[in-house]
C-alpha cells in the first residue's frame, strides 16, 4: 500500500461557545490486556519461547532494536502458556493461520467491549441512544464480523447501523475519525460508537535469518483497544464535548507502495517496512499541514497541539526535526509509544486520550 498521511484538524473545545455543526468527540475509553512484557527482558523471553537461543548474534541484534525503540513495555494477549499450547505460532514459516484466527475471532470483540464500556460510561447516556457502530481491526477477518459480535456483547439495538473495516493498519485510527465525522454530520441525532481493537497474534512468529523486518515487528507492536462516542448535535446540559473535529483529509504519497507492506499468508500477517519510511513521512507531512491549516491562517506548527500516531521512534524523531517542533509537542505520542508500543489503529486514539488528560492537568 502507498504511504498515507492523515491530517485531522481538531480544536480543543471546553471553552468553545459555538458547538453546533461540526462533529465532536464526547467520550474516550481505552483497554489493554492484563498481560504485559518488559522491553528490556523481552529478547530473552522471545528467543527462549521460540527455541532460538542458539541464534546468539540474531538475539543481540534484536536486543539492540528493542533498546533503541524507546518502548518501556507492551501489553500482549499472547502469554507463555498460550504459546506453549500453540507451538506452531513460534516458528517463522509454520502454517498457523487457523490457530491465529481462532484466537483473534474470539478475543478482538472482547477487548473492544472493554474500551467501549469505558467510553459509554464517560458519555453518561443510555446505550440505547447509540445509532451507529464502526469497528476496525487489523487482527483477523471473519463473517459475521467483530462489529456483529460487539453488538451482541454490548446489547446494542438490533437496528444499529454497523460498518466493519478490516486490514487498514496504522492508517485506520485517523480514517475512523474521518468516517465518524461524516456519519455524525450526516445523521441528525446520530450517536456514533467508534471502536478500534488490535491484537498482534497475527504478526508473532519466531526469528528468521533472512527477514530482519520480522525482528522490528516483534519489537514494535502491542495490543489494545480504544473507543469513542462521536456526534454533531449536543443535548444541552446532558453532553459535554472533549474535541471538535473541524476538518479531515487524506493524502497518498506517490511511488511509495514498496515502503510499507503487510501480507496475509498461511503463516499469519507478514511485515515489511523499509528504512525510508521515516524520511518519506517527514518530507511530505508539511505539504499536508499547509493544505489543512491555510484556511485558518495557521502556519506556526508549534502554535497547535499534536495528536501524532507514534508509528516508531525514528518516525517521531524525523517529523519533529523536519517541522522544528518543540519537545513538548510530541510528548503525548512519545508517552503512548513508551507505555504501549505501536497499537496500530488504536494508537492515535490512545494518544488523543493522553492529550486530553495532559491538557486537563495543565489547565
UniProtKB/Swiss-Prot annotation:
The keyword Plastid does not apply. It catalyses: (E)-4-coumaroyl-CoA + 3 malonyl-CoA + 3 H(+) = 2',4,4',6'-tetrahydroxychalcone + 3 CO2 + 4 CoA. InterPro entries: Chalcone/stilbene_synt_C, Chalcone/stilbene_synt_N, Chalcone/stilbene_synthase_AS, Polyketide_synthase_type-III, Thiolase-like. Pathway: Secondary metabolite biosynthesis; flavonoid biosynthesis. Its EC number is 2.3.1.74. It holds the Pfam family Chal_sti_synt_C. The keyword Acyltransferase applies. Belongs to the thiolase-like superfamily. Chalcone/stilbene synthases family. This is Chalcone synthase B. The gene is CHSB.
Amino acid at each position: 500500500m502507498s504511504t498515507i498521511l492523515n491530517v485531522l484538524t481538531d480544536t480543543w473545545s471546553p471553552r468553545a461557545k459555538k458547538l453546533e455543526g461540526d462533529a465532536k468527540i464526547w467520550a474516550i475509553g481505552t483497554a489493554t490486556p492484563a498481560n504485559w512484557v518488559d522491553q528490556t527482558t523481552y529478547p530473552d523471553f522471545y528467543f527462549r519461547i521460540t527455541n532460538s537461543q542458539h541464534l546468539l548474534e540474531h538475539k543481540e541484534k534484536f536486543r539492540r532494536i528493542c533498546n533503541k525503540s524507546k518502548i518501556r513495555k507492551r501489553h500482549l494477549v499472547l502469554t507463555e502458556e498460550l504459546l506453549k499450547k500453540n507451538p506452531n505460532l513460534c516458528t517463522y514459516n509454520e502454517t498457523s493461520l487457523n490457530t491465529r484466527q481462532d484466537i483473534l475471532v474470539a478475543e478482538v470483540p472482547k477487548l473492544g467491549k472493554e474500551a467501549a464500556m469505558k467510553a459509554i460510561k464517560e458519555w453518561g447516556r443510555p446505550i440505547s441512544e447509540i445509532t451507529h457502530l464502526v469497528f476496525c481491526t487489523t487482527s483477523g477477518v471473519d463473517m459475521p464480523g467483530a462489529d456483529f459480535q460487539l453488538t451482541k456483547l454490548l446489547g446494542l439495538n438490533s437496528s444499529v447501523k454497523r460498518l466493519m473495516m478490516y486490514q487498514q493498519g496504522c492508517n485506520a485510527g485517523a480514517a475512523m475519525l474521518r468516517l465518524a465525522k461524516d456519519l455524525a454530520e450526516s445523521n441528525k441525532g446520530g450517536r456514533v460508537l467508534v471502536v478500534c481493537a488490535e491484537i498482534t497474534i497475527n504478526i508473532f512468529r519466531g526469528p528468521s535469518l533472512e527477514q530482519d523486518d520480522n525482528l522490528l515487528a516483534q519489537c514494535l507492536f502491542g495490543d489494545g483497544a480504544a473507543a469513542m462516542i462521536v456526534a454533531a448535535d449536543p443535548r444541552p446540559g446532558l453532553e459535554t464535548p472533549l474535541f471538535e473535529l473541524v476538518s479531515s483529509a487524506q493524502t497518498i504519497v506517490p511511488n511509495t507502495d514498496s515502503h510499507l507492506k503487510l501480507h496475509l499468508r498461511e503463516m499469519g500477517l507478514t511485515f515489511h517496512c523499509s528504512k525510508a519510511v521515516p524520511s518519506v513521512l517527514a518530507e511530505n507531512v508539511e505539504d499536508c499541514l499547509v493544505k489543512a491549516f491555510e484556511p485558518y491562517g495557521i502556519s506556526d506548527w508549534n502554535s497547535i497541539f499534536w495528536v501524532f500516531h507514534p508509528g516508531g521512534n525514528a518516525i517521531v524523531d524525523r517529523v519533529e526535526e523536519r517541522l522544528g517542533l518543540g519537545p513538548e509537542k510530541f510528548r503525548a505520542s512519545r508517552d503512548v509509544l513508551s507505555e504501549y508500543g505501536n497499537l496500530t489503529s488504536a494508537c492515535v486514539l490512545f494518544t488523543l486520550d493522553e492529550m486530553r488528560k495532559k491538557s486537563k492537568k495543565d489547565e
